[in-house]
């Protein structure tokens, strides 16, 4: 409940500062960003430059807020779009998996220290690695995605970026968008 209140208050402040992203209770899924971001500095890491907190690889799926780049990873206009894509991917391909199963699928041991990743996310969220089930319709997913993005290398983001990403997912993806699985 506290998270919902925080998200609503943050949204109201940003709507006042940057103008509304919603009209008639519908989000404009073609807006660019709530804030102004410039992550073109090559000294920042790839997930941060690409506003891609989940370090999502390019596939045939087209995401809202997607931009073009030359790397093998998706890039987005702002962090909230990257988080929305992350929530979409978790929803479509990870729902019902335990925390451990989801992270082993997201970050396989071939490329990652997956066990360390699982322990980190479980510790930071307080979720049991074998009991917590991925469910994007439960706001506990916000903390899950936040700590995943930390291990994926996202820097300079805020809790608001994660929460806005969840709102973007809710308005632009959930139950409204039919997308092919990867």
PLM feature spans:
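Cell-wall polysaccharide-cleaving catalytic domain and substrate-binding groove, primarily
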Residues: 19-182
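Bacterial N-terminal signal peptides
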Residues: 8-16
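Positively charged n-region of N-terminal signal peptides that target proteins for export
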Residues: 1-4
């Amino acid at each position: 409940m506290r998270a919902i209140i925080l998200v609503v208050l943050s949204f109201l402040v940003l709507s006042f500062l940057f103008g509304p992203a919603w009209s008639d209770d519908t989000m404009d899924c073609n807006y660019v960003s709530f804030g102004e971001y410039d992550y073109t500095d090559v000294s920042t890491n790839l997930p941060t430059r690409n506003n891609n907190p989940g370090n999502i690889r390019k596939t045939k799926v087209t995401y809202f807020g997607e931009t073009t780049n030359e790397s093998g990873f998706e890039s987005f206009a702002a962090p909230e779009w990257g988080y929305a894509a992350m929530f979409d991917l978790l929803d479509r391909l990870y729902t019902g998996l335990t925390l451990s199963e989801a992270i082993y699928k997201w970050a396989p041991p071939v490329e990652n220290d997956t066990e360390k990743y699982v322990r980190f996310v479980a510790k930071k969220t307080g979720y049991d690695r074998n009991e917590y089930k991925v469910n994007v319709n439960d706001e506990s997913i916000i903390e899950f995605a936040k700590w995943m993005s930390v291990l994926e290398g996202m820097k300079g983001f805020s809790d608001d970026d994660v929460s806005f990403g969840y709102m973007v997912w809710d308005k632009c993806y959930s139950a409204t968008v039919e997308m092919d699985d990867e």
